[in-house]
Each structure stands twice: as structure tokens, then as C-alpha cells.
């Protein structure tokens, strides 16, 4: 046990109020010789922890799953999911929710140990995780947070001192993941598949109380819950698209009810603009390609709506109609969010009839000339149009004149327009080749300085600094396309 007054542990376990079918209580499997690799000091402080205390051996033992803090009730959550379109009953196969940290401001966050050992849901897996993928999740999740995209976060990475075996022998690690909750679309699918309306209602009531208390007093809280989840996901997916983020594995078990991005396994950021961009080695059909993400989110949310049908209305036909009506609103909400965001990226405050055409012309030219997505928008922001093929093209020159004329017709000044662009066009993203470079140095050489420099550069993505310059260059074109794997 720890002294929570010194370290800051302030755990509750409200998830255990749900029926026992939703989880299995099980302790983490201890590891041989845990070592703290990375601690997120600023996140620790916001959660109410003393970072210096967390660096002590007794606390590292908690982050490794070797000891249990006061107030913890370790459990593996059960859920289901459509994985690449195929339904499976799943669950936390290598992660344990140890409790919910109540912050000094009264907020509640799940504290989950990822890689903490086997559970009843492990499906023949060893329940462990490798150091490289855990560091990768740390880097990407914190970059997403800095980009102002709702996301789970990473509190710490601890090496276990034990090897794990995949294609080769790899160093083991445990990630401490922080989330508003780990309730997923797949959690509702799991409840619906079991056929108990009481259990489904219990999950919905718990979710409303935890995430959407404002809908408790509405005429139909379950319809309102569906509406709120759709609204948050429409906002989230638009934010992904606007920075060129490709999740890679948008299965229903990776769609959170809170609207946070979760699971950074095969994700990556787009370099040259292409709607068909795919990085995941297992997405051979391009199901989760960049341009498909809004459609797949709608598909996933339709699975949530299906799961809720038994409690949306007592008449099944009416419930089905409600579900269909609500899901049909996603595309409009997404388009509105994306359109507003892309206009900000171009410094547009007002609406004009031909704005959609203006935006489409730029994106079409970017795709034709394989323009770097992030750097193109930043070049427009900084008004430094250098020797990229796009900027020399007749299509771009024509578009640029139209855009400048459009800016001049606004009542806001061009200076205001460029300020708006600066706040919406990042200088830096976690470039895939730079992330791999940092991971290789860390895992192969035990050199964490490359990762630290990358994290520092990613911390303020909208503010240019000299330290960021080296991280803004796209990868050199190669015959081997970049591929990601489900290591996390």
C-alpha cells in the first residue's frame, strides 16, 4: 500500500457497480525487475500525483503491477467488437483497469496498466507488451494531445526486465494509460449480444452518469446518449482528417463512448496527400484508408445504435427508425466540422458560395502533385512558397489567385487570416520516419535522448522553433512504402 497523501493516489472503482459479466477482477502479474523509462510529469501533476514520488521504487512497483495502490480494484473489462467487419467477443487481453483517479479538480480518469499480464480474455496471448510499441503509444498519444485532439494519454512507461517473444525476442514493458473511460462501442455490443436488457440499461445508465450527466433529465436519455456520442465522434474524426491522422484499425472496440482516440497500434500520419493512404500492414483492402475514416466511423456508430435498439423505444420498429434517423445525422455533423476546420486552415472566417469548390481545387492539385499535407498548409500560412512541384504548377497558381481574392473580400484583415491559419496548421506532426528513428535508438541502443528531443519538438506543434526544423522534413521517397503493425 502507498501513502496517497504523499504520492497522490486517490482511486475509486465505480466500474464495479456494473453487473459482474462486464469485467473480471484479477491482479496484475508481477514482473522481474521494473525500471521507469518515461514519466509524464505534467500529466502526473494534473492527475494529482507528485512526480518525484512516482519515481521512487515503491511507486514504480505499482506502475509495473507488482504492488497494488490503496483503493485499487484491478479488473479486466469485457467487450466485443467488429474487427475488420467480423464480430468477435473480446475483452482486455493484456490490460487491467486498476481504478479511477479522482483529480484535485474532481475529474475522474481511468488508470490502466497495459501489458500487465494474461487475463481470462487473452485468447492464448501472453498478456504482455513490447517496449517499442508502448513508447510509440506514448509519443503519438502525447502528440495528439498537443494537437488538441481528444485522446487517451500516457502517464508512464516501465520496462519489465523480462523478454517477450513475438517474431523475435523483444524487451517487455508496461504502459500506464489514462482515459476518461475505456467504455467502447464494443462494450455496448457485448451487452446487447448477451441479450439482457437489464445489463444493457445498467451500462447505459452508468455511461450517462459518467460522461453525459446533462442528458439524464431529458425525455429519452438513451436517445440523447446516442446523439451525444455521434456528436463527439463527428468532431473527433474531423480533427483526425484535418491533421492527416490515419488510425488504421477503426474496429468498434476502438471507438470510445467518450469521444477520445484510443489504440495507437497501426496508426500513422499522412505525408503526401492522398485519400487512399493506408499504413496498416493488416488493412490489405484499405477499409480504414484516410478517405474512408468518416464512413467507417458512421458504420461503427450504426453498430452502437443497433446495440441500443432494445432500450431506445418499447416498440421495436419505432426504435429502429430512431436509430436510423440519428445515424443519418453523423455525415452532416462530420462535414460541418471538417468544413469549418479546413476553412480555418485557409484563413477563411466567413462563408461564400464557392468556398467548397476553392477547397476542392487545392486538395485535387495537392493529390496530383503528391504535395506534403502538413507542409503545404504551413507554407501557405507562412507565405513561403518554395520549390515544391505543387507551387510551380499552373493549377496552384490559378488557385492561389482565387484564394487571395477570397481573403481580400473578407472584412477581417489578411493578418487576422494568417493568425487563424497559424493556430490551425501545425508546423510539426510525429513524422513516421522520425518516430521509428526514436524507437530504434531507444529499443536497440538504450538511447532515449532521440525520443526526448522528438517529444520536446512535438509539445508545441503550432509554434515554430528552430528545434522543430529537422522534424518537419518529409521522408525521402523509397520503393518500400511505410508500414505499421498492431504492436500496441
From Swiss-Prot:
> Residues in the active site?
253 (proton acceptor)
Annotated positions binding ATP: 91, 93-94, 114, 126-127, 177, 184, 263
Sorted UniProt keywords: ATP-binding, Magnesium, Manganese, Metal-binding, Nucleotide-binding, Nucleotidyltransferase, Transferase
Q: Reaction catalysed?
A: L-seryl-[protein] + ATP = 3-O-(5'-adenylyl)-L-seryl-[protein] + diphosphate; L-threonyl-[protein] + ATP = 3-O-(5'-adenylyl)-L-threonyl-[protein] + diphosphate; L-tyrosyl-[protein] + ATP = O-(5'-adenylyl)-L-tyrosyl-[protein] + diphosphate; L-histidyl-[protein] + UTP = N(tele)-(5'-uridylyl)-L-histidyl-[protein] + diphosphate
Q: What is its EC number?
A: 2.7.7.-, 2.7.7.108
UniProt keyword annotation of Phosphoprotein present: no
State any single GO MF term: magnesium ion binding
UniProt: Mg(2+) binding residues: 254, 263
* Domain of life (superkingdom): Bacteria
Does Calcium appear among the keywords? no
What cofactor does this one take? Mg(2+); Mn(2+)
Q: Which family does it belong to?
A: Belongs to the SELO family.
Q: What does this protein do?
A: Nucleotidyltransferase involved in the post-translational modification of proteins. It can catalyze the addition of adenosine monophosphate (AMP) or uridine monophosphate (UMP) to a protein, resulting in modifications known as AMPylation and UMPylation.
- Name the chain's protein: Protein nucleotidyltransferase YdiU
Species per Swiss-Prot/TrEMBL record: Bacillus mycoides (strain KBAB4)
State the encoding gene. ydiU
